[in-house]
Amino acid sequence: MSFFDGIPVAPPIEVFHKNKMYLDETAPVKVNLTIGAYRTEEGQPWVLPVVHETEVEIANDTSLNHEYLPVLGHEGFRKAATELVLGAESPAIKEERSFGVQCLSGTGALRAGAEFLASVCNMKTVYVSNPTWGNHKLVFKKAGFTTVADYTFWDYDNKRVHIEKFLSDLESAPEKSVIILHGCAHNPTGMDPTQEQWKLVAEVIKRKNLFTFFDIAYQGFASGDPAADAWAIRYFVDQGMEMVVSQSFAKNFGLYNERVGNLTVVVNNPAVIAGFQSQMSLVIRANWSNPPAHGARIVHKVLTTPARREQWNQSIQAMSSRIKQMRAALLRHLMDLGTPGTWDHIIQQIGMFSYTGLTSAQVDHLIANHKVFLLRDGRINICGLNTKNVEYVAKAIDETVRAVKSNI
């Protein structure tokens, strides 16, 4: 007999399960388009040169130690991260009504923000986009939200943002509902609202007294321009809207396993900040208590040293540019093959992911017959493509959509 008898086996986390399937595959030709991480033209992880140089500098700095950071995190990092997403000239910064909280990457920021809203502010209803990142619903359910609902985001027939239903669903949301918005490079679709559409979304959220929770995991990585990628967030701030923003530095700094994140908070009344920070400290104390220093030190040094920041800008532009080239190459090969269906959405999307429109049956066929590994909803990581495998992937998709029919 065990205290743990009868515990059911949970289904595997798909993205990591598919990644393991790829690693275990013994076929001589295989392609991994699953896990959300950047890869070079050679298919390898990339340590940004500026990150490596900064790590060496930190390692040689004998003034540093391993004492605990404050509960809310590395002060310089928090300030730099908040300025990165809001802009140094943001009214929220100038009026001292914003601040950052260091968290364990984007997931930790989502969890801390969600738990705070549920336990301190008694917000229990959240809306996430349909489709959305696979972890959003789980995080908010575990944080204490009792209603986790969807708003329409994707037009599956026309492969575009379904702005009409998006706005209609927001209109129907109860007052004080939390609305999760992807700041840029929507995961999994890779398609963002236009600036005019963002303005419509902001108008409804403000008028209906809904609460905005932005999740921005790809700032700078999406377009190569950190300011452009944060446009929607800065517009909402300019409209006088309160919000929290989950930031991740996994993709744009390549610091996946350092778990570097920030929760930027924007309020309308600076007088509430002391209470907010004190209650947030209790939320974090009961979770990870104190955040790790290494990744935060790297990001802080890079963002606050002009020469290093310029190096970082060049790196994110290089990553963004390679992704765009691979999108164009995949589309070109599909067009050359005369692949049935419409595929222009591949180059209309941004960031590392493409929501291909492939069905689950077609995904199973691609994996079984071509050893091209991707998620069941048809999401592919464009970073997994390179000049050596993109034609193979296009031919695999072409054979698959001819063999396994759908309405693409």
Curated annotation (Swiss-Prot):
Superkingdom classification of source: Eukaryota
Keywords: Aminotransferase, Cytoplasm, Pyridoxal phosphate, Transferase
E.C. code: 2.6.1.1
Gene3D superfamilies the UniProt entry points to: Aspartate Aminotransferase, domain 1 (3.90.1150.10), Type I PLP-dependent aspartate aminotransferase-like (Major domain) (3.40.640.10)
GO molecular function term, any single one: pyridoxal phosphate binding
Catalysed reactions listed for this entry: L-aspartate + 2-oxoglutarate = oxaloacetate + L-glutamate
Residues annotated as transmembrane: none
Residues the record lists as N6-(pyridoxal phosphate)lysine modifications: K251
UniProt: L-aspartate binding residues: G36, W133, N187, R379
Location(s) in or outside the cell: Cytoplasm
GO CC field: cytoplasm; cytosol
Pfam families, alphabetized: Aminotran_1_2
Required cofactor names: pyridoxal 5'-phosphate
Subunit structure: Homodimer.
Additional record remark: In eukaryotes there are cytoplasmic, mitochondrial and chloroplastic isozymes.
PANTHER family, per database record: ASPARTATE AMINOTRANSFERASE, GLUTAMATE OXALOACETATE TRANSAMINASE 1, ISOFORM B
Known function: Biosynthesis of L-glutamate from L-aspartate. Important regulator of levels of glutamate, the major excitatory neurotransmitter of the central nervous system.
Family designation: Belongs to the class-I pyridoxal-phosphate-dependent aminotransferase family.
Protein name: Aspartate aminotransferase, cytoplasmic
Native source species: Caenorhabditis elegans
